[in-house]
Amino acid sequence: GDDTRRRRTERTRPLERIAAIIGGKDEADACEFLIPRVRADLDAGRLIPAALTLEVAVRATIVETDMSLEDGDHEADLDTLESSLPALEVMRDRALTGDGAWEGLGAEIEAPLAVAERVLRRRRVLTQ
């Protein structure tokens, strides 16, 4: 019934967006590519590539979603991301030294990544 149709619509909505982007009917923001890339690297244990990409992914998320919603939670998450930028720059620079991953790096990546993912999910849900 209606519940089944609603669940199917919720499941396929991201696919519709992907199809529109591929078909040239819609444009994706850089953060929509970068944030999932960081997640894929982190989940696969590629901590250094994730650490190198996270700062620019978070910066893109802030810039590209700043004015997209008037929502207190959205603004609080963007403030959290913005305040994380100095630490993400340090992380990026440390990852560039070539010394490999360090203890706790995965958790350092996970926290701001989860906030950025939440920002993108919220924007997707509230702008449709």
Across the structure, where does each feature detected by a protein language model lie?
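Helix-loop junctions and short alpha-helical segments
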Residues: G1-A28
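Solenoid-repeat scaffolds in large eukaryotic assemblies
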Residues: P49-A50, A57
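Alpha-helical junction/boundary sensor with strong preference for TPR arrays
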Residues: A60-T61, D99
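Hydrophobic/aromatic side-chain positions at a characteristic register within alpha-helices
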Residues: L42-D43, P49
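Accessory, solvent-exposed terminal regions and/or long lumenal/extracellular loops of proteins
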Residues: C31-L34
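Conserved small-residue packing positions in alpha-helical repeats and bundles
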Residues: V38-R39
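Long, charged low-complexity segments
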Residues: D73-Q128
